[in-house]
Regions:
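Conserved active-site segment immediately N-terminal to the catalytic lysine
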Residues: 155-202, 224, 247-251, 299-300
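PLP-dependent aminotransferase-like
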Residues: 67-171, 178
Length: 409
């Protein structure tokens, strides 16, 4: 048997990406410029949205969405307890109060009945999270928001454009996902995407903010606000300032520095060309995994349903009957067999930062149950079918072995 060493999620970079980056390096313009603008345009085409703003991370995108909406002190923003910290930390960055909701049984989505109960007169935004690229139930989300419309009081220009709680999707994993045929980005009111090195589509670091078409939104004005907030509050970006005689500018708010560079965008332009084939290969791998685990104690999340076609960013599984300790032993045994794996994620109330904010894991039992026996397997386009088969057989064997030993002891 071959000696395997299977990484969790390496980037898929070809000579085409390298050539495009080299072209940018030779061009004399490497920060935000024409290639960033071109990537924004093409991403808007891909997601069927009016505008896209490329930034240096999805976290920056999520925070800037809240800042454009002028969410701040005295406001509440609702997030699921089962997510990565970035979904929630941005709420504290703007001075608002995070409100966590437990998830449904056997899935990562918020319990929509609990969500409805969590809404108050202070609720300004709900942040659903598309874990692994699996899109949430937006029909239900918008029903909840409409039902609670009378509680909402707008306190800013863009809040008035909605006149209800705004749904801001954390779609870090979901570029290429669809809900009832609609692409992620065009479903929620606002959406943030991640282009981090481990994502399906990468610019090394990076992310974007976008919004769905809305007659109450002036898209050019909205885009300009994002641009200003992403570059110190400056009224001109670097490319505009460098035009002959165009040095004059103003700072209209003491803002941030989170713009994307043309070096990063160069990667993205080629990745977007390749993206259909990258998604197809991920689908083939997930289908192979699903067939291999059918009838076993390994239960993966479903990436395709009647309403959802996932981007298949993560292959999240649960090991039936495994305790937290057994789950951790299985991960160690997989590592010994040359298979990298991961856990997505520690629920937020388990983390020190959120304990210090007063959150208690005991209040979110289903989030803990989801975490307790969860293992994420390698899912990337460099995996061979042979490696996938090895992972399947090893994972099943190791899981049975660990659970059998636990019963004996």
């Amino acid at each position: 048997m071959p000696n395997y060493n299977i990484p969790f999620s390496p980037p898929d970079i070809t000579e085409a990406e390298i050539a495009e980056v080299a072209d940018t390096l030779r061009s004399g313009w490497i920060t935000t410029g024409p290639k960033t603008k071109e990537l924004e345009r093409r991403l808007s085409q891909y997601t069927q949205t009016p505008k896209t703003v490329c930034l240096n991370s999805a976290t920056a995108a999520l925070e800037l969405i809240l800042r454009v909406l002028e969410v701040g002190p005295g406001d509440e923003v609702i997030v699921p307890a089962m997510t990565y910290t970035a979904s929630c930390s941005v709420i504290t960055h703007v001075g608002a109060t995070p409100v966590m909701v437990d998830i449904q049984a056997d899935t990562f989505e918020m319990d929509y009945d609990l969500l409805e109960q969590a809404i108050t007169e202070k609720t300004k935004v709900i942040i659903p999270v598309e874990l692994a690229g699996i899109v949430c139930d937006y029909d239900r989300l918008f029903q909840v928001v409409e039902k609670k419309r009378d509680l909402f009081t707008a306190s800013s220009k863009w809040q008035k454009a909605f006149n209800r709680i705004v749904i801001v999707s954390d779609s870090a994993h979901a570029l290429g996902s669809t809900y009832k045929g609609q692409p992620a980005g065009s479903i929620a009111d606002f959406t943030s995407f991640s282009f981090h090195a481990v994502k399906n589509f990468t610019t090394a670091e990076g992310g974007s903010a976008t919004w769905k078409a809305n007659p109450a939104i002036d898209d050019e004005e909205m885009y300009k606000e994002f641009q200003i907030l992403s570059l110190h509050g400056q009224t001109k970006d670097a490319l505009a300032k460098m035009q002959l005689g165009s040095w004059e500018y103003d700072i209209v708010t003491p803002a941030y520095k989170c713009n994307m560079t043309d070096i990063m965008a160069s990667l993205g332009l080629v990745q977007l060309d390749r993206y259909p084939s990258l998604l197809q290969r991920r689908k083939e791998i997930v289908d192979r995994y699903d067939r291999g685990f059918a009838g076993s104690r390994i239960h993966p999340l479903a990436h395709k349903t009647e309403t959802v076609e996932s981007s298949r960013h993560l292959y999240i599984t649960h090991v039936e009957g495994a305790s937290l300790e057994e789950r951790n032993l299985i991960i160690q045994e997989l590592a010994k067999a040359g298979i990298a794996s991961n856990v997505h994620y520690k629920p937020l109330p388990l983390l020190t930062a959120y304990k210090n904010l007063g959150f208690d894991m005991a209040d979110y039992p289903r989030a803990y149950a989801f975490f307790e026996n969860e293992i994420t397997l390698p899912l990337h386009t460099k995996l061979s079918d042979e490696e996938v088969d090895y992972i399947i057989e090893t994972f099943k064997t190791v899981s049975e072995k660990v659970l059998a030993l636990s019963k004996k002891s």
